A protein has these predicted regions:
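C-terminal amphipathic alpha-helical interaction region
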Residues: 254-255, 259-315
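C-terminal substrate-binding/catalytic lobe of Rossmann-fold NAD(P)-dependent dehydrogenases
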Residues: 17-22, 27-31, 35, 39, ...
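Surface-exposed beta-strand edges and their flanking turn/coil or helix-capping segments
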Residues: 7, 37, 146-147, 289-292, ...
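Ligand-binding pocket scaffold of soluble enzyme catalytic domains
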Residues: 6, 10-13, 42
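Residue-level marker of structural boundaries
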Residues: 13, 140-141, 286
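Short, well-structured alpha-helical segments that form the helix of a local strand-helix-strand
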Residues: 9, 133, 278-281
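Short, small-residue-biased leader/transition segments that mark boundaries at the very start
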Residues: 1-5
Length: 315
């Protein structure tokens, strides 16, 4: 096994310091599970980028070159990643006749099933992998071509009267979309690592989440500088319960949260579908809501099915 590991590491992608993006993850299918969650996160990343693109396209009036410039700029900062980079390339790409290729690609997104597997695993673990779930459902929605065509005719406008949108998409507004994307991305990764933590505890895998984030930093679809921060968070606190509890990410989330709320409101006001952004914000607000409405649900369950309940005022 040692020689085999050495052979694999010798041909693996390397980080800037030369360390390989190949490590032993754990026993009993732990590596396969981690790869599955990686692909689920990939679904979330791609859908969030697509939703940001949709919002910018509909609200700025920029052509594909202008939108490509935005993603190119974002790729120079904290959103630097393979997926942001190729999004810029795709937006800029023109065919020989001068048409943007993207505008001639049918908007039906295929899938191989790994996103669905992640969602199924989350259901089995009882873990709210809400953003990846919405990303999978968004691909299902894209396949409803006939229904979408009919609905676009019957309900041509989804705007809410003449209400002012929360985001004015000038330069500062575009920066707000960038910050909203960062916040939603953070929430998606927090959910993904939470799922791995639950599976690790149940299966006795003792996963090293800092190492997992490290080996994802090169040689894979979700490679990004963002993962370096995740590596640092788990290196500093291996038992970190949720990425949102890390000091750096806490500060970054506090700064980006107004942008996430603003983008969600803007999309609602203007009838723009952004299920993953909506889901990210709902998860965040649900997580920080110490007193939820689940007591009513439990009371309902007891009322019709005698499922019992726990009291808060007695043992």
């Amino acid at each position: 096994p040692t020689r085999r590991s050495s052979d694999l590491q010798s041909i693996a992608a390397k980080l800037e310091d030369g360390s390989p993006c190949c490590e032993w993850i754990g026993p009993g299918g732990a590596g396969h599970y981690g790869k599955m969650v990686h692909n689920g996160i990939e679904y979330g990343d791609m859908e969030l980028i697509a939703e940001a693109y949709s919002m910018l396209k509909k609200r700025t009036g920029l052509d594909n070159d202008g939108l490509g410039d935005i993603f190119e700029l974002w790729n120079r900062g904290e959103l630097n990643s393979f997926l942001i980079e190729i999004t810029s390339h795709i937006l800029h790409y023109k065919e020989e006749n001068g048409d943007y290729l993207l505008d001639h690609i049918l908007d039906v997104a295929g899938q191989k099933g790994t996103g669905k597997w992640s969602v199924m695993a989350a259901l089995d673990e009882g873990d709210p992998l809400t953003l990846v779930s919405e990303a999978v459902f968004a691909r299902f929605m894209s396949s409803l071509v006939n229904e979408r065509e009919r609905a676009s005719v019957q309900y041509p406008s989804g705007k809410v009267g003449d209400m002012e949108a929360c985001i004015t998409l000038n330069t500062s507004g575009i920066e707000a979309v960038r910050d909203a994307l960062y916040a939603a991305k953070l929430i998606s990764y927090a959910q993904g690592f939470s799922l791995m933590r639950r599976a690790s505890e149940r299966n006795g895998w003792n996963l090293d989440y800092g190492t997992i984030a490290k080996i994802w930093r090169k040689g894979c679809i979700i490679r990004s500088v963002f993962l370096e921060r995740i590596t640092q968070a788990f290196t500093k606190s291996p038992g970190l319960q949720n990425l949102l509890f890390d000091a750096f990410f806490h500060e970054r989330m506090e700064n980006a949260l107004p942008a996430l709320r603003g983008m969600v409101v803007d999309c609602v006001f203007n009838g723009i579908a952004a299920p993953c952004f909506f889901s990210a914000l709902s998860y965040f607000d649900g997580l920080r809501n110490f007193t939820s409405a689940a007591n009513l649900i439990q009371a309902q369950r007891d009322y019709f099915g005698a499922h019992t309940y726990e009291r808060t005022d007695s043992e």
